[in-house]
Amino acid sequence: MTLVYMNMALAFTISLLGLLMYRSHLMSSLLCLEGMMLSLFVTMAVTILNSHLILANMIPIILLVFAACEAALGLSLLVMVSNTYGVDHVQNLNLLQC
């Protein structure tokens, strides 16, 4: 395993542990999810560049599109929870029912 892959696996693991440990605030959960998506993007881009797959060059860009959609939905949910309850605790997400 090269140094780049080991660093990206470590970054993904640290982000996953952060997501599992700091679940009380929505903002910290969103930051950990973004760290996971960024490490996946770099890993996929390096893998595709090393294997010289021309047709697979679009896959990391599609992952970035999904990451941007996830960030936009997460931030809009954060704004809605903050405006409704005044805090960004994940516990309040169960109370947001129609």
UniProtKB/Swiss-Prot annotation:
EC number assigned by the record: 7.1.1.2
Catalysed reaction equations from the record: a ubiquinone + NADH + 5 H(+)(in) = a ubiquinol + NAD(+) + 4 H(+)(out)
Bilayer topology term: Multi-pass membrane protein
Major localization class: mitochondrion
GO cellular component, one term: respiratory chain complex I
Function description: Core subunit of the mitochondrial membrane respiratory chain NADH dehydrogenase (Complex I) which catalyzes electron transfer from NADH through the respiratory chain, using ubiquinone as an electron acceptor. Part of the enzyme membrane arm which is embedded in the lipid bilayer and involved in proton translocation.
Protein name: NADH-ubiquinone oxidoreductase chain 4L
Protein's gene: MT-ND4L
